[in-house]
Amino acid sequence: MEEFKRYFELDRYQQHDFLYPLIFQEYIYALAHDHGLNRSIFLENAGYDNKSSLLIVKRLITRMYQQNHFLISVNDSNQNQFLGHNKNFSYQMISEGFSVIVEIPFSLRLISSLEGKXIVXYPNLRSIHSIFPFLEDKFLHLNYVLDILIPYPIHLEILVQTLRHWVKDASSLHLLRFFLHEYRNWNSLITPKKXSFSCSKRNERLSLFLYNSHVXEYESIFVFLRNQSSHXRSTSSGALLERIHFYGKIELRVGVFAKDFQSXLWLFKDPFIHYVRXQGKSILASKGTXLLMNKWKYYLVNCWXCHFYVWSQPRNIYRNQLSNYSLDFLGYLSSXRLNTSMERSQMLENSYLI
């Protein structure tokens, strides 16, 4: 970690993170190979064993300096030569190392925050296991639910723009842009399937990093609910140390929302709103009225489009009344059964004897 820090100290006053030199360091790929999510990435390719994998990486990095080795054809076939090797194999190898590199700013900020000051504990930051108490204890007392499919970026460039808030190294962002645009037709990193995300299994680490970066931006609009919500962490966020910085980053956006949405701030004063998220969808449940949930629905759509440049159609947000709706979440069907009681009233006529 000390060896990584020196690349950040070159221009610290301007807060530029020089990550690009790390791409050409061989030990980065050894780290990705030993501690990455796809340990078998080097072993699945015929003709390459564990002992020769680092030598292959070193040759690939050396050839990146030479322009004549970028033999990229218009045809997106798996047999195209990229850096003198199989295109998919070379891309996987380099992008795995690149994934480790772009995670460094997140880990360094986490370490500095731990050493510099005590982190405020948020009692609403709960694990995936908090969903079940929510369904058992809170669900029965709510009236309406918004079943939300997490919106996906309109364009791959949106993912790059999202990382610009974290990584200030232009060269690294250009390389990421090259990866995304060159391989957007090859088993896409983040593929919208039925308006939900599907991460590539061939490069899971980079897919999860980009996915969680995008979801962190999407969820930042719920800053006003952080003290009341039942927040469930995504089960696929293991590759991104984002949770602490998620709450630190959204504090900066409070002024933006307070300025642009003064008339809508009363929406966030409902103390009976609960929020959970998992498996490409999120749920916003409330004890409020149907009018309040409709206002939430159109506010979310407009806010995502204006501030985060993500496309979410109103038809991807379903408003349902819990008395007539079964909630499908994490393989469980939950419904609220109304206990009706019948009351009989009888008017007694007073008779007066005259």
Curated annotation (Swiss-Prot):
Signal peptide feature range: none
Superkingdom, natural source: Eukaryota
Localization terms from the record: Plastid, Chloroplast
InterPro entries xrefs: Maturase_MatK (IPR002866), Maturase_MatK_N (IPR024942)
Keywords per UniProt: Chloroplast, mRNA processing, Plastid, RNA-binding, tRNA processing
GO CC field: chloroplast
An annotated Gene Ontology molecular function: RNA binding
GO BP annotations listed: mRNA processing; tRNA processing
Purpose: Usually encoded in the trnK tRNA gene intron. Probably assists in splicing its own and other chloroplast group II introns.
Name of the protein in question: Maturase K
